[in-house]
Amino acid sequence: MAHPELDLQSMKEWRHAMHQFPELGFEEERTCALVSRSLTEWGYDVHTGLADTGVVGKLVIGTGKGPKLGLRAEMDALPIQEATGLPWQSRVSGKMHACGHDGHTAIMMGAAKALAKMNAAGQLPGNGILHIIFQPAEEIGGGGGAQRMKRKVCSTLS
């Protein structure tokens, strides 16, 4: 199997874009749009609106008959005022990606892009289904986003 080529420049740009416009739990509309648009462009079957702002991209590998694998990233920010002075500092008052979910989402997008490219070139072994899962509202507590996403993903994609 070939090694994936990660688009590090795009990953950096996605992270900075998300960092500048952080969204709290169940408000991840801008992030959802970026993720779903990108996954669609890379050939994923995209499901949006799961647990309000969750996104899942489905990639069929080979015949699709085989194991199912899910990879998950969180998307939400925290209600914190950013004062880092960085060029990509939050532009939204009282909201910040202090938890690193902008990085988590950008890394997962980079992996999704690389895996789709490898799949299109016939470089992924075997047969099965890959689900790339972008979960909203991880920071809300009590498992709100995770539990809602789990119910929706399992019922929608099984």
Model-derived regions: residue spans:
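Acidic/His- and Gly-rich active-site-bordering loop/insert found
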Residues: 1-97, 106-129
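Membrane-interface loop-to-helix entry segments
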Residues: 99-101
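Acidic/histidine-rich catalytic neighborhood of metal-dependent amide-processing enzymes
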Residues: 103-158
